Regions:
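Short, flexible, mixed-charge glycine/proline-rich loop motifs
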Residues: 1-7
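Structured secondary-structure scaffolds
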Residues: 10-231, 273-277
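Short, structured coil/loop segments at alpha-helix boundaries
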Residues: 46-58, 181, 241-251, 299-302
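Helix-rich, typically C-terminal accessory recognition domains appended to large enzymatic cores
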Residues: 206-243, 250-302
Length: 302
């Protein structure tokens, strides 16, 4: 029960007071799919990530599923229930079905359906239950495969505070992108916190991350190498030489980092994938310092 009792009233997580009403409704027999959902998740432990969210969902299912109301009579808008226009479909029924209809369903032989289903869903943690309990049960009832994975990401706070209109701390994405750049903001969001966790957003954190990683590390390395090659090698790279021990060590590490990168990306662990990139950049900076090609120019012009 997510309701909070305050001053004799029940308050929803959103802060709104809960009003109890009665209305006629159609129900989906969600309870009949409890065991099958448990079996599916036990056999597919990577189908919900991060792991903490998987455990959360499985615990919820095991606690007992109740049948789900899937129609409303108090709404004047919505998709009518077949054969009973007094009812409209519960919004999450038609919203979730968009994943299928947008790729050609009910034509399961369409190219888009074959290419894109089952799909990877990346959703906010607040709508995880809809995507990992109700949605797969609907699909199983329709004899369709559940999503290949549901990844639940966290929320951002603004300098430690929840982002809301009432607090006046909503972040204007256009302003931020205009100031720092689109790819830079994407990089910050993925690099700053593990994808799936909550994170704190601040302009100071953006500046520190961009300066440390992109300017001082990546940017400095590219500038050092490219300016040297342009100045001393007529902007050409030659490969007619034998690798020394340091070359082989860096090449071996590059392969290792690339394999780790692919592994982490396949599990949406984007922060870990980026960490591999910057570990390799650090190793490359050390390699360049040790090789000191600016000194080699004086002793070996070739």
């Amino acid at each position: 029960n997510e309701l909070i009792k305050k001053d004799g009233k029940f308050i929803a997580p959103s802060g709104a007071e809960v009003e109890w009403i009665k209305e006629e409704s159609y129900f989906f027999k969600l309870s009949e799919w409890q065991d099958r959902l448990i079996d599916f998740y036990n056999n597919n432990p990577k189908s919900i990530l991060p792991e903490s969210r998987f455990n959360e969902v499985l615990s919820f299912i095991k606690s007992g599923l109740k049948d789900l109301s899937v129609s409303r009579t108090t709404f004047k808008w919505g998709i009518p229930v077949p054969n009973n226009p007094k009812h409209v479909m519960y919004v999450w029924i038609d919203a979730l079905c968009n994943y299928l209809t947008s790729i050609g369903y009910p034509d399961e032989n369409s190219a888009n359906f074959k290419n894109y289903w089952p799909a990877l869903h990346i959703v906010g943690k607040d709508i995880l239950r809809f995507h990992s309990v109700y949605w797969p049960a609907f699909l199983m009832a329709a004899d369709l495969e559940p999503p290949s994975r549901v990844f639940a990401h966290g929320w951002w706070t603004n300098e430690g505070e929840k982002i809301s209109k009432s607090l006046g701390n909503v972040i204007d994405p256009y302003e931020i992108v205009s100031k720092y750049g689109l790819d830079q903001i994407r990089f910050f969001l993925f690099r700053e916190v593990p994808f799936g966790n909550d994170g704190d957003f601040s302009k100071e954190a953006i500046a520190q991350r961009l300066n440390a990683d992109l300017s001082n590390n990546y940017g400095n390395l590219v500038q050092r190498i490219c300016s040297f090659v342009k100045k001393n090698c007529d902007s050409k790279i030659f490969n007619n030489f034998d690798n020394n021990e340091d070359d082989n060590i860096l090449l071996k590490s590059s392969i290792k980092r690339l394999n780790n990168y692919k592994k982490y990306m396949s599990n949406q662990e984007i922060d870990k994938a980026l960490k591999e990139v910057f570990l390799l950049l650090n190793e490359t900076n050390i390699y360049v310092d040790k090789q000191a090609p600016w000194n080699l120019k004086k002793t070996n012009t070739e």
